[in-house]
């Protein structure tokens, strides 16, 4: 069982000394991954429903949320082992050729430690502000991931799809791994789980307790089998998010198929104290499992 840390580049951690200290400390304490979120803009008022908690995003619009790729590249320069992941990247808001280049660059600079955590988005008003249609964002995400994988693995790439068209382009540098960068999908709905089974390298479930996580994983396993894929083809991670858990819950998560738990600090102001608390309560017990 591995323990990851949510989230760098959010709120008080949007400061060079804190990004550096969090990254170095998390690596030293044995965390597996540091995760960085993404929102290009937030709004004071919106009609969209946040899929967790009360239905409202649990932070005001002026909460700092740094660009995750810049943040993780900075963290990469401060570390040598810990994995670096977007949690999550709103892929349909991006140009996939530009995003493929950004992801490959961060992966290359980190020595192959990057994971692209992907979400399709929930905040329609953010899409509208950026100028991207909210409708068909799932289909857009699928095509964008297909495009990025071509650009990461082929010397020259062509694509003629619904959203993207280009002929014989070269995108370098490539990621460290010849197969490209791992793509993990977030979400708990049936469409989200189908994305994992059909073309994901991993899953990031959120706001799930052990029994809930086990139920979702059982469904993923069914979908994988239907697609002719193996359970070992995907990595399964879960964040309890707002749900309080104890070290005793780690075994229940593991028995349900969870391989990594992503935890948020429970100290509001002292980020490093929160990291150290998570390490004592969860990283150390998880290492003994």
Residue ranges and their predicted role:
Residues 1-289:
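Active-site-adjacent structural elements that line small-molecule/cofactor binding pockets in enzymes
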């Amino acid at each position: 069982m591995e323990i990851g840390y949510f989230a760098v580049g959010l709120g008080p951690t949007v400061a060079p000394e804190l990004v550096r200290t969090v990254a170095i400390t998390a690596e030293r304490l044995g965390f597996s991954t540091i995760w960085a979120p993404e929102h290009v803009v937030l709004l004071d008022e919106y009609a969209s429903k946040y899929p967790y908690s009360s239905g409202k995003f649990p932070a005001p619009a002026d909460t700092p949320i740094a660009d995750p790729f810049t943040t993780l590249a900075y963290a990469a320069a401060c570390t040598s082992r810990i994995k670096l992941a977007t949690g999550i990247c709103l892929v349909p808001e991006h140009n996939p050729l530009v995003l493929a280049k950004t992801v490959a660059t961060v992966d290359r600079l980190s020595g192959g430690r990057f994971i692209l955590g992907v979400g399709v988005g929930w905040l329609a008003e953010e899409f509208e502000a950026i100028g991207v249609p909210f409708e068909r964002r799932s289909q857009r995400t699928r095509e964008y991931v297909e495009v990025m994988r071509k650009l990461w693995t082929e010397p020259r790439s062509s694509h003629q799809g619904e959203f993207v068209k280009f002929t014989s382009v070269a995108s370098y540098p490539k990621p460290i791994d010849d197969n490209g960068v791992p793509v993990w999908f977030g979400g708990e709905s049936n469409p989200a789980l189908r994305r994992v089974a059909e073309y994901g390298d991993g899953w990031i479930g959120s706001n799930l307790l052990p029994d809930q996580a086990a139920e979702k994983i059982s469904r993923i396993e069914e979908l994988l089998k239907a697609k002719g894929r193996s359970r070992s083809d995907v990595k399964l991670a879960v964040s309890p998010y707002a749900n309080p858990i104890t070290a005793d819950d780690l075994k229940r998560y593991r028995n349900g198929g969870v391989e990594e738990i992503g935890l948020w600090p429970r100290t509001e102001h002292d980020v490093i104290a929160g990291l150290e608390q998570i390490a004592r309560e969860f990283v150390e017990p998880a290492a003994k499992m």
